[in-house]
Amino acid sequence: GYSWELPRLASGMSAGLPRVYDIALETISHGDGRLDPDSLARFIIAYQTVTTLTLGELWAIPIMLRLALIENLRRVGARIAHDRVDRNLADSWADQMIDTAETDPKSLILEIADMARSNPPTSSSFVAELARRLQGKSPALALPLTWIEQRLSESGLTIEQQVQAENQHQAADQVSIANSIGSLRFLAFMDWRKFVESMSVAEGILREDPAGAYAEMDFASRDHYRHALERMARRCALGEAQLASLAIALARAARQDGNER
C-alpha cells in the first residue's frame, strides 16, 4: 500500500514505522492532543530544519495525525478503564465494610484483615474511591483508612496525596479527550492543499521558476509537476528538493542561453 512507500525509521522506539507517523505521535504528545494550524506548522518547520519531508509524507500527515489522535484516545480510554476496575474494587470493599459496621461492628476488624490479605492496590483511583466512601461515616470506618494510610506510608505517600493525584489524573484525562476530539474536527476542516504547498521544500524551490509560470499555474497543474518530481525521486539517488533545484538550475541556464542568443 501507499504507506510502504513512506520513509521508515530504522531504530528507536518507533523502528519500522513510517517516519511521519512518529512525527504525528510527537505532535499529539507535545500538545496533549491539541492541534491548531499554527502549532502544527511550527512543528513541521522545526522538524524540517533537520530532515526534509517528502511530498508523500506531507500528504500523509492528516491521516497519520488521525491515527495518532485515535491512539491517544485509546491510551486514555485504557487508563480510565483500568482505573474503573480499581474504583469498583474499592466500592466493593466499602460496601462490605459499611454493611458490617452497621450490622456487626465487632466483625469489622475481620473485614479489614480480609482486605489486607487480598493485597489491594494502592493506586490513586482505589485509595481516592475508598476514602470518598468511608471518610466521615463513623469512627469504626476510620480503621480501614488507618490501615491504608500505614500501607501508603511505606511508599512515602498519604491518602490526601493520592486523592489529589486522582483528581489531577481525571482532570488531565478530560482535557486530553476534549483536545483529541476537537483536533479530529480540526483535521476535517483544515485546508491540506494549502498546508502541503506551504510546507514542501521542493514546492518552494519550484516556485523559483525563472519564467514565473509555475507559481501562476492552478493547483492541479502544479500537482502534476510534483507527481513527476516524486516519480523521478523514487528512481534515482537524488531527493525531491535536489531534483527541484536541478530543474530550476536548468531552466535558468536555458533562459540565460536564450537571452544570449
Region locations from a protein language model:
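Short acidic/histidine-centered micro-motifs embedded in hydrophobic/aromatic stretches
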Residues: 64, 76, 246-250
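ATP-dependent phospho-/nucleotidyl transfer catalytic cores
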Residues: 1-17, 41-42, 59, 67, ...
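Basic, amphipathic N-terminal segments
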Residues: 1, 91-261
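A generic short alpha-helical patch detector that favors 3-5-residue windows
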Residues: 12-19, 35, 39, 122, ...
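Extended charged low-complexity segments that act as oligomerization/scaffolding linkers
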Residues: 72-79, 83-84, 95-106
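Active-site activation/catalytic loop segments of kinase-like enzymes and analogous catalytic loops
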Residues: 16-58, 65-82
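Short amphipathic alpha-helical segments and their helix-coil junctions
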Residues: 2-8, 43-52, 204-211
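A ubiquitous short alpha-helical element
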Residues: 8-11, 27-33, 62, 115, ...
